[in-house]
Amino acid sequence: MTNIRKTHPLLKIINSSFVDLPAPSSLSSWWNFGSLLGVCLAVQILTGLFLAMHYTSDTATAFNSVTHICRDVNYGWLLRYLHANGASMFFICLYLHVGRGLYYGSYTYSETWNVGILLLFAVMATAFMGYVLPWGQMSFWGATVITNLLSAIPYIGTDLVQWIWGGFSVDKATLTRFFAFHFLLPFIVAALVMVHLLFLHETGSNNPTGIPSDPDMIPFHPYYTIKDILGFLIMLTALSALVLFSPDLLGDPDNYIPANPLNTPPHIKPEWYFLFAYAILRSIPNKLGGVLALVMSILILALAPILHMSKQRSMMFRPLSQCLFWLLVAVLFTLTWIGGQPVEHPYIIIGQTASVLYFLIILVLMPATSIMENYLLKW
């Protein structure tokens, strides 16, 4: 008798995706982050759903409703901090997942890669709108500053900003619509994840060597299921430690002050996971130029398949490209640090140097190094 998991219309889809899926035998721990992102999304949707049961999206009561969740709802504090720090874990896994894709040349699966970029934008939009909901000082001013960037778009900019605000400033209408979109977007993200996996399973996974692994495949279950479960345990332990020992470590103390349109915080800055892009935005004195650089700092990932000049797919056997890759990582850490600093000397010039280096490495140095490595292969 044939196993039901191979014949049932629904179970056979799950079976071909998670059980009998042929996978390369050499996948390292860098391939764990896809499944970790799935767990992060599940945690965020579940905690978010329970938070939404107690939250009110009204300027008069939003801040107090979050306080009520933390003080009066059973384990409300746990839900709130799991959700807030879960977002940080989500972005840590996201950036590591993207970094893995860049290092091992996974971007050559262009459909999977492009859906991944769409996912990154969708998650960033979701996180930004979620940050506005507690209606603290940094929520309000962050929303004001970031939405105001759209006014740099020629001709339609001002109208567009007022249309998004639902008025002439960030107010009740803005908060209500941000809550609506923040609730909706994770489900769109979940749908995009399905498309991402669909495209991935069309080609099969890449592997650390970048060499086709068709002759040497193993079933996903039990080898990679047990490996993924170990990853889940490590990540959930880290998240639990963060939530239970220092839940406010990654947050901004200004967000414990209720939003006040008449009082601007001394340093307006987004959550830590947007600081690198914020630093690139601030490094350009022109408003429109800054906005374009901000968008391009993420959209540049879409150029990765075009900029790939090497005859080898992975960086595993390309030491010069490896050096550049880790220099890029160092530049990103520098940008993240600068994004959290005030706009004054020497931070301005450091930020501008790091921003130039960021684009220079990706657009010029990496392709040039790849071409040079191709010549070295002939020797």
UniProtKB/Swiss-Prot annotation:
Keywords from the UniProt entry: Electron transport, Heme, Iron, Membrane, Metal-binding, Mitochondrion, Mitochondrion inner membrane, Respiratory chain, Transmembrane, Transmembrane helix, Transport, Ubiquinone
Cofactor note: Binds 2 heme b groups non-covalently.
Cofactors (names): heme b
Top-rank lineage group of the source organism: Eukaryota
The UniProt record lists the keyword Electron transport: yes
Residues passing through the membrane, by range: 33-53, 77-98, 113-133, 178-198, 226-246, 288-308, 320-340, 347-367
Record: residues binding heme b b562: 83, 182
Positions bound to a ubiquinone: 201
GO BP terms, alphabetized: mitochondrial electron transport, ubiquinol to cytochrome c
Gene Ontology molecular function: metal ion binding; ubiquinol-cytochrome-c reductase activity
Topology in the lipid bilayer: Multi-pass membrane protein
Residue numbers binding heme b b566: 97, 196
Role played: Component of the ubiquinol-cytochrome c reductase complex (complex III or cytochrome b-c1 complex) that is part of the mitochondrial respiratory chain. The b-c1 complex mediates electron transfer from ubiquinol to cytochrome c. Contributes to the generation of a proton gradient across the mitochondrial membrane that is then used for ATP synthesis.
Leftover remarks: Heme 1 (or BL or b562) is low-potential and absorbs at about 562 nm, and heme 2 (or BH or b566) is high-potential and absorbs at about 566 nm.
PANTHER family, A to Z: CYTOCHROME B
Family statement: Belongs to the cytochrome b family.
Entry protein name: Cytochrome b
Taxonomic path: Eukaryota, Metazoa, Chordata, Craniata, Vertebrata
Gene: MT-CYB
